């Protein structure tokens, strides 16, 4: 069967700290075009690779990868909230297949996800509940982090499983590109934040969540004025990365260490491993070609903002 892929940056700052209207119109046009291509493909199953931002996964148990057999979006930063339509038996079968392939994939029957999962479903499909989805968490912020090689192998394992289903499969990768917003780190946290990172942050009081969101908004506003206030965006790296994906050279990323990536492009750039997993997955379907490449650094969203599609040719 055929597969389609779309990878898209996300940002909680959309609608809170937006770029100039002409930039916003440009991005919205890119997303609208991707949405049209996806609608024409008419997917029967979505595999969504996305990260978390200490809203669903914490240091009480922090897996490198987790498949949601059941999942609920919390609606942070005004993103969509509610249950994701996960086909339970299919998710269970996927987990077994991936484990048999040698990848230690965790599962959750009550996975809590944030805007990293919700935004691509909203922007590209029109809502959380439009198409059955297998939500796959890839740890992108909490050290120790999975590397490129293991993430690629995860994508390949999931791709091999879905290629046997006789369904039109849409692979989505959510996150990146270069960026380093103000995300807490366990090694530097005070007692209160440490407690939150160890798990109590899963059910934040509304007032504390609002303060947390306002800190991110304030950081973005300062970053627009002075891009020395956070790790700078890296358009050169971002474009080189997208070219590697387009040319089917993702295996070259295996040699890039987590420490090197953080130094080059920022500590939250590890979200790009969702793109790697998606491209690895579609590669198992046979020949494919990329389309719809777009990139622009957007300081207002603290992100090198990218969008890239691919489709199988068999």
From Swiss-Prot:
UniProtKB keywords: Aromatic hydrocarbons catabolism, Dioxygenase, Iron, Oxidoreductase
Pathway: Aromatic compound metabolism; 3-phenylpropanoate degradation
Cited InterPro entries: DHPP/DHXA_dioxygenase (IPR023789), Xdiol_dOase_suB (IPR004183)
Enzyme Commission (EC) number: 1.13.11.16
Keyword Magnesium found: no
Signal peptide region: none
The protein's required cofactors: Fe(2+)
Domain of life of the native organism: Bacteria
Pfam families: LigB
Record-level GO BP terms: 3-phenylpropionate catabolic process
Entry's transmembrane regions: none
Active site: 115, 179
Catalytic activity entry: 3-(2,3-dihydroxyphenyl)propanoate + O2 = (2Z,4E)-2-hydroxy-6-oxonona-2,4-dienedioate + H(+); (2E)-3-(2,3-dihydroxyphenyl)prop-2-enoate + O2 = (2Z,4E,7E)-2-hydroxy-6-oxonona-2,4,7-trienedioate + H(+)
GO MF entries: 3-carboxyethylcatechol 2,3-dioxygenase activity; ferrous iron binding
Free-text function comment from the UniProt entry: Catalyzes the non-heme iron(II)-dependent oxidative cleavage of 2,3-dihydroxyphenylpropionic acid and 2,3-dihydroxicinnamic acid into 2-hydroxy-6-ketononadienedioate and 2-hydroxy-6-ketononatrienedioate, respectively.
Family classification: Belongs to the LigB/MhpB extradiol dioxygenase family.
Quaternary structure note: Homotetramer.
NCBIfam families according to UniProt: PRK13370.1-1 (NF009907), PRK13370.1-4 (NF009910)
Protein name: 2,3-dihydroxyphenylpropionate/2,3-dihydroxicinnamic acid 1,2-dioxygenase
Underlying gene: mhpB
């Amino acid at each position: 069967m055929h597969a389609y892929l779309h990878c898209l940056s996300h940002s909680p700052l959309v609608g809170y700290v937006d770029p100039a209207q002409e930039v916003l119109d440009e991005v919205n046009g890119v997303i609208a075009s991707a949405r049209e291509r996806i609608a024409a493909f008419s997917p029967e199953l979505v595999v969504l690779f996305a990260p978390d931002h200490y809203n669903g996964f914490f240091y009480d148990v922090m897996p490198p990868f987790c498949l949601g057999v059941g999942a609920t979006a919390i609606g942070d930063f005004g993103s969509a909230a509610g249950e994701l339509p996960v086909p339970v038996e299919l998710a269970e079968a996927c987990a077994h297949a991936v484990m048999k392939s040698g990848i230690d994939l965790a599962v959750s029957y009550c996975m809590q996800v944030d805007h990293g999962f919700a935004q691509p479903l909203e922007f590209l499909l029109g809502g959380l509940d439009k198409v059955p989805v297998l939500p796959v968490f890839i740890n992108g912020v909490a050290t120790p982090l999975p590397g490129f090689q293991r993430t690629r192998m995860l994508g390949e394992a999931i791709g091999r499983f879905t290629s046997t289903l006789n369904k039109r499969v849409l692979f989505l990768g959510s996150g990146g590109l270069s960026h380093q917003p103000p995300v807490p780190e366990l090694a530097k946290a005070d007692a209160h934040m440490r407690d939150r990172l160890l798990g109590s942050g899963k059910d934040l009081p509304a007032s504390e969540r609002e303060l947390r969101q306002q800190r991110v908004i304030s950081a973005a506003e300062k970053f627009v004025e002075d891009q020395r206030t956070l790790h700078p965006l890296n358009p050169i790296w971002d474009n080189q990365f997208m070219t590697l994906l387009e040319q089917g050279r993702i295996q070259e990323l295996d040699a890039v260490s987590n420490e090197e990536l953080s130094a080059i492009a920022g500590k939250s750039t590890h979200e790009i491993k969702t793109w790697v997993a998606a491209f690895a997955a579609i590669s198992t379907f046979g020949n494919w070609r990329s389309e719809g490449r777009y990139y622009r650094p957007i300081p207002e969203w603290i992100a090198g903002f990218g969008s890239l599609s691919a489709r199988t040719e068999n």
